[in-house]
Amino acid sequence: MTGRVEGKVAFITGAARGQGRSHAIRLAQEGADIIAVDICAQVDSVPYPMATPDDLAQTVKEVEALDRRIVAVQADVRDFGALKAALDKGVAQLGRLDIVSANAGIASYGPAGELAEQTWRDMIDINLTGDWHAAKAAIPHLIAGGRGGSIIITSSDAGLKAYQNAAHYVAAKHGVVGLMRTLALELAPHMIRVNSLHPTQVNTDMVMNEPTFRLFMPGTEHPTVEDFRPVSQALNALPIPWVEPVDISNALLFLASDEARYITGVTLPVDAGAAIK
């Protein structure tokens, strides 16, 4: 099947690499033009290197190689004004908006009683408030278009269950579910659907780094990806250690397409069965 989102425009936050880049490519493969946003800068409380302007440029290159249009802007999802300006610029150039992937997110770790105040605030501001900002900026365009639309928010298995040493992450990702369900109710009269995705570990830079490995192996001084592999696999029901970004992108494509035209308010795990363990 091809052209599943032909002629539509998708707004993706966190689009410079990882799941966001994968979403941009997968939607472009099926006919969508892309508005891509990423901070392309480091957040001090994040323990791994974040995306760069070169990463965002690579996303542009890969989308354009598919003969689709893309408008890419550096913006911080914590800054509503900047995010709205980025989206408005994209809509002005591409002419419409149909799909929103509120995907930007960070990870950091520590016992709840020991988290720094700024670490907590950064997590909530990016992983929860940032998703609200993306939706808030998009809603007027979706309503004005009169064609309905699809908002897909990236949560996590941590939005469905608890994990130790990640209270701020778990709180933000659970909060996303409440946001999604409320938006689904509010926007249903406009035929705008809102759903959330809940991945297990994904093979991206946000997961494949030593600080994340240490979360799952606190007794290992310098854990490697090979150390992490069996520990990660034990979290999933299916015998795999992690999923690939395209696995999440395929689920997002389904929710964005007319195949899911009556699906709204759903928490969709793409997690190799992690949520049922």
Q: Where in this protein do the model-derived segments appear?
A:
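Canonical Rossmann dinucleotide-binding motif of NAD(H)/NADP(H)-dependent dehydrogenases/reductases
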Residues: G3-I39
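Substrate-binding pocket helix/loop in short-chain dehydrogenase/reductase
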Residues: V63, P111-A112, A116-I124, S232
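Active-site helix of classical SDR
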Residues: A135, A172, M180
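Residue(s) in the substrate-gating loop at a strand-loop-helix junction
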Residues: S156
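Short C-terminal tail/terminal secondary-structure segment
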Residues: K161, P239-I240, L252-L253, T264-K277
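Short, small/polar-rich loop/turn modules that mediate ligand/substrate recognition or access, typified
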Residues: A188, R193, I263-G265
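A conserved structural motif in NAD(P)-dependent oxidoreductases
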Residues: V225, N236-I248
